[in-house]
């Protein structure tokens, strides 16, 4: 009996020994596999699940106030750049534009009259100058006659009455020359006044054109057009809504504007650089694989841009690992239409690329 019991004991010991060695071998194999995986795979990747899909959202806002007369799009609709999205009540702006255009027309007509008056004034100056030339010729002729008559009077050839006659003509010629010169001065003054008035009128026309352009801009702004091609979201108006400048009417997600913002720990970015490949997994579609590339790094940690950045100079210091936002461009994919801003993402950077 003792031999049988001893044999069973030895058999059990050997079995336990084999099991122990088997378990130890499996654990050792896993350990070696883990070490090999770390050295050949894991240490070349940095991952984070603190990542989200983002987009350069374009907010559409009106430039003028008014009631929405027509709404030409629906929420989630695809639109093209320059497409009319809504039409605001433009009757007031149309009336102001028409009035400003009438003012411009009136002032331009007045400018035409002014230019005609200037033309007449120049003709008057030419005519007055002709009168001066004629008066100067008469005066020169009569002056010679006057001087000749003076000599004849001294010699007693003519009577005093004859001399006074030519003297009267000579004085009249002097008066006529003065009158002609005064007419030239008056015509030139009139032209100067007209030219000054024209300068003022031109300034008024320029100002009127500026007002007309402003009203034209306001009138054109009654049509709300899409600044980019993309997809409508967050539609906040309907027909009959009253809007004002800086009111957010809707958002547009531009085409090809999606990217991932991954917030890596500061201890993870040592070997990261722009252009490295990134594997992306969306929580919404875990079976789909997306890829991307590092596009840029934030100039500061996320906490730096918060409304209340941490102040570690107060003496109450707790060291916290900071997060650095990394922008990742998403590569083209057949399933890119499934990617929406705000989705959660797991990002894994391949440090070997």
UniProtKB/Swiss-Prot annotation:
Membrane topology summary: Single-pass membrane protein
Protein name: Colistin resistance protein EmrA
Function in brief: Probably part of an efflux pump system that contributes to adaptation to osmotic stress and resistance to colistin.
Chain segments annotated as transmembrane: 21-41
Primary residence: membrane
Any coiled-coil regions, as ranges: 132-204
SUPFAM superfamilies: HlyD-like secretion proteins
Subcellular location: Cell inner membrane
Family label: Belongs to the membrane fusion protein (MFP) (TC 8.A.1) family.
GO cellular component: plasma membrane
Entry's induction text: Cotranscribed with emrB. Induced during osmotic stress.
Keywords recorded for this protein, A-Z: Antibiotic resistance, Cell inner membrane, Cell membrane, Coiled coil, Membrane, Transmembrane, Transmembrane helix, Transport
GO biological process: response to antibiotic; transmembrane transport
Listed InterPro entries: CusB-like_dom_1 (IPR043602), MFP (IPR050739)
Gene3D superfamilies, alphabetized: 2.40.30.170, 2.40.50.100, Helix hairpin bin
């Amino acid at each position: 009996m003792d031999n049988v019991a001893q044999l069973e004991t030895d058999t059990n010991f050997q079995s336990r020994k084999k099991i122990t060695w088997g378990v130890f071998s499996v654990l050792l194999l896993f350990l070696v596999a883990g070490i090999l995986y770390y050295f050949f795979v894991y240490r070349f990747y940095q991952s984070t699940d603190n990542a989200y899909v983002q987009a350069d959202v374009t907010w559409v806002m009106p430039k003028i106030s008014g009631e929405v007369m027509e709404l030409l799009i629906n929420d989630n609709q695809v639109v093209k750049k320059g497409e009319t999205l809504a039409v605001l009540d433009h009757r007031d702006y149309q009336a102001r534009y028409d009035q400003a255009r009438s003012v411009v027309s009136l002032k331009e007509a007045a400018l035409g009259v002014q230019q005609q008056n200037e033309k007449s004034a120049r003709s008057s100056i030419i005519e007055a100058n002709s009168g001066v030339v004629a008066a100067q010729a008469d005066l020169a002729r009569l002056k010679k006659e006057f001087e000749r008559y003076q000599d004849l009077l001294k010699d007693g050839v003519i009577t005093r009455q004859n001399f006074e006659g030519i003297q009267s003509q000579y004085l009249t010629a002097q008066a006529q020359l003065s009158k002609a010169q005064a007419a030239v001065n008056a015509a030139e003054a009139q032209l100067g006044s007209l030219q000054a008035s024209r300068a003022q009128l031109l300034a008024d026309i320029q100002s009127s054109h500026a007002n007309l352009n402003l009203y034209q801009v306001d009138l054109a702004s009654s049509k709300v057009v899409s600044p980019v091609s993309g997809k409508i979201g967050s539609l906040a108006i309907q027909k009959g809504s009253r809007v004002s400048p800086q009111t957010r009417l809707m958002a547009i997600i531009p085409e090809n504007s999606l990217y991932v913002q991954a917030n890596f720990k500061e201890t993870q970015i040592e070997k990261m650089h722009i252009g490295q490949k990134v594997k992306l997994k969306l929580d919404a579609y875990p079976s789909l694989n997306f890829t991307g590339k590092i596009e840029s790094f934030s100039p500061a940690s996320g906490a730096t841009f918060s409304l209340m950045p941490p102040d570690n100079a107060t003496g109450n210091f707790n060291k916290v690992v900071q997060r650095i936002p990394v922008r990742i461009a998403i590569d083209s994919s057949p399933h890119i239409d499934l990617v929406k801003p705000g989705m959660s993402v797991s990002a894994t950077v391949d440090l070997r690329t």
